[in-house]
Amino acid sequence: MRKSPVMTRTLLVLTLVVLASGRLAAQTPPDKFLGHKVGEDRKLADYTQIKAYFEKLAQESPKIKLFTIGESVLKKPMIMAAISTPENLAKLDRWKEITHKLRDPRVTPVDEARMLAKEGKAIVLITCSLHATEIAASQMSMELAYDLVTGKTFFDAGKILNDVVVLLVPSHNPDGNQMVVDWYRKYVGTKYEGGSMPWIYHHYAGHDNNRDWFMFNLPETKAVTNVLYHGWFPQIHLDEHQMGP
C-alpha cells in the first residue's frame, strides 16, 4: 500500500517524538549511577565517579555541556559543566562575548551596554569543595546537575535556564576529594571511622588553598580564576562550603 504524504509526515513526527522522549527518559539519576543515594550514610562518591557521572549526563541531555578548565597538581582533569537550554548552549561564545564587553564600564558605551545586557544571559558560576573535607558540595553537584536538566526542582528550572547559564565546577580540589574518600573508605566500619587524615588534603597547600586566591600559585586556583577573570566574568559566583560534624 502506498503511503500518502500526510501519513508519511505523521509517522515522521511520531518517530521524532518517540526518539526525543526516549532521550529524556534515558537521563540517569545519580543514585542509579552510583548504586546508592547521594548523601547516604557511609557512602561517598570519589572524583573519578563524579567526573564519570557528569560525562554520562552530558551524553544523555542536550542541556549540559562539559569543558576541561585545567588540571590538578596530580594531573586530574578539572571539569566544568555549562547547564542551560540547548539554544543557549549553542550560543555560548556569544554570551561570553557579551560578558567580556560588559566587564568594564570604561570599555563599552552606556547605550551599547544596556542593549548587550538585554540580549545576554546571566552567568552563574558554582564551585564545590574548595576544602576537600567539606565533602557534601562535590556530592551534591551531581544531584544539582540532574535536577536542573530534568526540571525536577521546586522552581521552574526550564524558565530560569532560558535566561541563565549555570557553570558548575563539581570539585575545586579533585586530588583532595580523592584523598578524603579513599581515607574514609579504608576505615569505614572500624573504630577509626570519621578520623581525620594524618596529612593535608592538598598536595601542597591543604586548607590554605583558598588563601591562594591572591597569589595564584596552584593550578587549581589558576583554573577557576581563569574562568572568573578571563573567560566568563560571571555576574554571580557561589562557592559551596560545608559546616557540621
Pin down the residues of each PLM region.
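Bacterial N-terminal signal peptides that target proteins for export
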Residues: M1-L12
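Bacterial N-terminal signal peptides
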Residues: T10-R23
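Mature N-terminal segment immediately following signal peptide/propeptide cleavage
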Residues: Q27-A82
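C-terminal accessory segments enriched in acidic
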Residues: Q27-L44, T48, P219-A223, V227-P245
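Second-shell loop/turn segments in exported
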Residues: K37-L44, T127-E134, N210-F214
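Surface-exposed loop and adjacent secondary-structure segments within mature catalytic domains
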Residues: G70, I79-T85, K91-K101, E112-K121, ...
